[in-house]
Every structure is written in C-alpha cells, then in structure tokens.
Regions:
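N-terminal intrinsically disordered/low-complexity leader segments
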Residues: 1-16, 205-211
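Solvent-exposed, amphipathic alpha-helical segments
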Residues: 20, 24-32, 78-82, 111, ...
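Amphipathic alpha-helical segments used for helix-helix packing
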Residues: 92, 105-126
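Short coil/turn segments at alpha/beta junctions that flank glycine-rich nucleotide-binding fingerprints
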Residues: 31-35, 85, 150
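Hydrophobic/aromatic-rich alpha-helical bundle segments in the mid-to-C-terminal region
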Residues: 124-130, 134, 148-211
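Hydrophobic alpha-helical connector segments
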Residues: 66, 77-109, 161-165, 187, ...
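Short, basic, alpha-helical segments at the C-terminal edge of helix-turn-helix-like DNA-binding modules
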Residues: 69-74
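Helix-turn-helix
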Residues: 20, 24-62, 66
Length: 211
C-alpha cells in the first residue's frame, strides 16, 4: 500500500516562513497551551514537513520561550494602553484590577502557569518568565508611584506593594483555572485587600465604567 505524499510546500522568503512558524506557535499556545508547541504540531499547523520547521527553528525551546514572551508582552501592552488614558492613578489601578480579574484572560493565564512549571527545566523559558514578571511589576509600580506622588495612595514601598499585588492577581487567576471562585469574588477580594494596602476607603477601587 502506498503512503500519502505530502504536497510540496510553497516557496516563501525566509522572513515569511519564520513569521508563519511564529504565528503557528502563537496560535497553538493560546489554543492548547505551551506544551502543545512541538515540532510536529507546528509543522502540521502550517502543512509543511517537520524538517522545514527545524530548518528555521533548530531549537524548539527557544521557540517556546519566544512564543511565551510575545503572548504575555502583548497582554501587558494591551492593559497598559487600556489604563494609560484614565485621568488618575486610582482610576488606572481600578481599571487594571477589573480587566485582569474578570475571567476573560484565562488563555493567557494558562500560558503563565505552564511557563512557571516548564521553566523549572527550561532555562530559556525561565529567563523569559523572569523578564516578563519584571515588566509587569514595573508597570504596576509606575501606577502606584504616581498615586503616591499625587497623594491618592499611601505606601512607603511602591515596588514591594507592586510585587504583592502581582502575586495576588497571579494566584487568584491560577486558582480560577480549576473553577475556584467566580470573577466577581476574585475582583472584590483583591480590590478590598489593595485598598487596605494603599490607605484607601473601602470601595475606592470598585470597577470603573470605561466608555
């Protein structure tokens, strides 16, 4: 019995092929998680031979690390843009908490959770995780420092408070992956805790209405 013959892949420039492979890895990760980004899976997604993917991406661990970085950096840029135009640090912080804890970002949360676990054995991925955690902490710290400067927030250490807040967000979102608690509870629990951390009145960080 003859085996099916794969149709020869259309010729593309190196830049086009590299972008196609990166896009396929990105889609696989968001749909099925980082562990799904394998040589064979990427090749199947773009209908080429695994050898062609290996030619452009000889180190799949590097591809996994870059895929993680691109996904989480895009989310950071999106959240930063969402809150940047709001008039006060308090409103920016409230909007940040609302969008990060409303349950709409579970696909990216899965990426984070898998990256923390896989990064124990994959140093390139671990380095990327550390870089992106630093980037998130820096963004949150900037909002807190602006609030301290304007007199809205009270904290002697905005950097430490930013790490605490990031840990709360990450932990609650990770728990949500196994359907523990609902989005409303996660948001209110975090908001009330952060209000206490920053010397705010209860309800000061209630979710805003963004028009």
């Amino acid at each position: 019995m003859s085996s099916p013959t794969r149709k020869k892949a259309a010729r593309k420039s190196p830049a086009e092929r590299a972008a196609e492979i990166a896009d396929a890895a990105h889609e696989l990760a968001l749909e099925q998680g980082l562990a799904a980004v394998t040589l064979r899976a990427v090749a199947a997604r773009i209908d080429v031979a695994p050898a062609l993917v290996a030619h452009y991406e000889p180190d799949m661990q590097a591809l996994i690390a870059s895929t993680f970085a691109s996904i989480v950096a895009a989310e950071l840029a999106e959240v930063d843009a969402l809150v940047a135009g709001l008039p006060t640090p308090r409103k920016r912080l409230a909007a940040m908490l609302a969008t990060l804890l409303d349950g709409s970002r579970d696909d990216v949360t899965v990426i984070w959770v898998e990256a923390w676990a896989m990064g124990r054995r994959k140093e390139a991925l671990a380095a990327g995780v550390r870089d992106q955690m630093d980037a998130w902490q820096a963004m949150i710290r900037g909002v807190l420092e602006a609030g301290v400067a304007s007199g809205e927030f009270e904290t002697d250490d905005p950097a430490a408070a930013a790490w605490q807040l990031l840990g709360m967000i990450d932990g609650l979102n990770a728990q949500a992956l196994v359907r523990w608690g609902d989005a409303a509870d996660r948001g209110s629990l975090t908001s009330h805790a952060v209000e206490g951390m920053l010397g705010l009145e209860r309800g000061a960080l209630a979710p805003p209405v963004i028009e």
